[in-house]
A protein has these predicted regions:
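Conserved histidine-centered catalytic loops in small-molecule metabolism enzymes
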Residues: 126-135
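C-terminal substrate-binding/catalytic core of Rossmann-like NAD(P)-dependent dehydrogenases/reductases
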Residues: 137-139
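Conserved nucleotide-cofactor-binding alpha/beta core module
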Residues: 6-122, 126
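SAM-dependent Rossmann-like transferase core, predominantly class I methyltransferases
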Residues: 2-4
């Protein structure tokens, strides 16, 4: 998913689903700034402590439901979602910057595919359905 996202040093990245923080650390190395959301309090706290201890200082942690993104910090050059909604959330597309890219698993529990959503410089949205996957639901 990270490779599909094509993150560069100038990018501001929204990550939904911090998890253990592994993906967050990779995004932190590749980008200028990461805004990450984790809905599970214990997981969020552990990830925050771990990544701060390791010196990842360009990450803003939020223990909250990130399924609607974070309008206050938008627009984002890249958005990575690590849980699967039934359909692509319009709220996230609206927060994608021109020339931005979002990688997100989409579908029901047993019928999910990675989707690569790009927005061109004019704001036109393009959606490409990719690899079959299985992620936890984005609730």
């Amino acid at each position: 998913m990270t490779q599909l996202l094509q993150v560069y040093p100038k990018h501001k990245v929204l990550e939904i689903g911090t998890g253990c923080g592994y993906q967050t650390a990779i995004l932190s190395i590749l980008s200028k700034r990461v805004i990450t959301f984790e809905v599970l309090s214990a997981l969020s706290t552990k990830s925050l402590k771990r990544l701060k201890r390791l010196g990842y200082d360009n990450v803003d942690f939020h223990c909250a439901d990130g399924k609607y993104g974070c309008v206050e910090e938008a627009p984002y050059d890249r958005i990575l979602v690590s849980a699967a909604p039934i359909s692509i959330p319009d709220e996230l597309i609206k927060q994608l910057a021109p020339n931005g890219c979002m990688v997100i698993p989409v579908g029901s529990l047993y019928d999910q595919f990675i989707h690569i959503i790009s927005k061109d410089k004019n704001g036109q949205v393009h959606i490409k359905k990719s690899t079959p996957v299985r992620f936890v639901p984005l609730v």
